[in-house]
Each structure stands twice: as C-alpha cells, then as structure tokens.
C-alpha cells in the first residue's frame, strides 16, 4: 500500500508494483495539509487507473467530522462509491455509518487508536478492515 497525493506519485506507485494506494481529497483527511493535489473530480480517474493495474484504491476520510462537515462528507463518500473506489478509510463514526448505509466498504484508520480486544470487537461491527494502533507490535 502506497500513499499518493498526485498523478506523479500514483504513477510511481504503479511502477513500483504497489497493490493498493491511499489518498485524500478536499479537507476531510489527515493528509490534506501535506500531500494532496486530488479533488472529488479525480475519483473516477483514480479508480479507473487502479482497476486497470489490478490495484485497490482507498480514500482517506479520517478526521473528526463536525456538524458543518456532514454534507461535504456525504458528498465525498457517495462520490467515492459511485466512482468505484475500493473503500474509505474512516476514523469518525459518522463516516463509518454513512459509508455502510450506501454499501461502501469501510476500513478503520489507525487514527482510532484501537489497542484492546474490546475496542476491536466494537469497531469490527462497523468495518470490513480494522487497522490497529501504531503503538502495538
């Protein structure tokens, strides 16, 4: 899995043989300030390129979602589903709930800091894949 934030880094991930990529768009992801040149209009192209190369595509929507973010979050997650993005990587329950309600696969972000079995059991109810906290080994 390779992080990508531009068409150039997507091409590099393909050339390096990555089997999947993750990326953010707009401002509802932890990478928004550092490495994302993609917009919602790029989702279909990204999904298509990944599909053409046998790769999975994961859209990060892994920030705290406030009431004023709900409409944008729904628009982004719905667009990801329609574009054929493999899954959304989420850390907020609102993203998990909405994505599941429209049939979009959900992967839970390490941002959730899941460090014990009870938390894992709980969050597994809402996700297809759970990424545990970085602190675990």
Where on the chain are the PLM-derived regions?
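Short hydrophobic/aromatic-enriched beta-strand-loop microsegments
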Residues: 20-24, 103-113, 129-132
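N-terminal active-site wall of soluble small-molecule enzyme domains
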Residues: 49, 55-122
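N-terminal basic/disordered segments at the start of proteins
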Residues: 1-21
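A structural motif
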Residues: 18, 85, 127-128
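Active-site glycine- and acidic-residue-rich loops that bind
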Residues: 1-4, 131-137
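Glycine-rich, proline-tolerant flexible connector loops at the mouths of alpha/beta enzymes
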Residues: 22-43, 60-69
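Aromatic/hydrophobic pocket-lining residues that form the small-molecule binding cavity
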Residues: 6, 39, 43, 73, ...
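Alpha-helix capping/helix-boundary segments
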Residues: 9, 94-95, 137
């Amino acid at each position: 899995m390779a992080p990508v934030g531009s068409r150039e880094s997507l091409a590099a991930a393909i050339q390096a043989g990555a089997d999947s990529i993750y990326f953010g768009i707009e401002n509802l992801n932890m990478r928004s300030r550092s490495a994302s040149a993609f917009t919602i209009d790029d989702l279909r192209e990204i999904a298509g390129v990944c599909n053409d190369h046998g790769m999975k595509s994961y859209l990060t929507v892994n920030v705290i979602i406030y009431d004023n973010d709900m409409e944008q979050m729904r628009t982004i997650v719905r667009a990801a589903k329609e574009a054929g993005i493999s899954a959304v990587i989420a850390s907020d329950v609102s993203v998990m709930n909405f994505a599941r309600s429209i049939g979009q696969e959900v992967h839970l972000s390490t941002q959730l800091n899941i460090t014990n079995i009870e938390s894992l059991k709980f969050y597994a109810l809402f996700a297809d894949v759970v990424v545990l906290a970085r602190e675990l080994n």
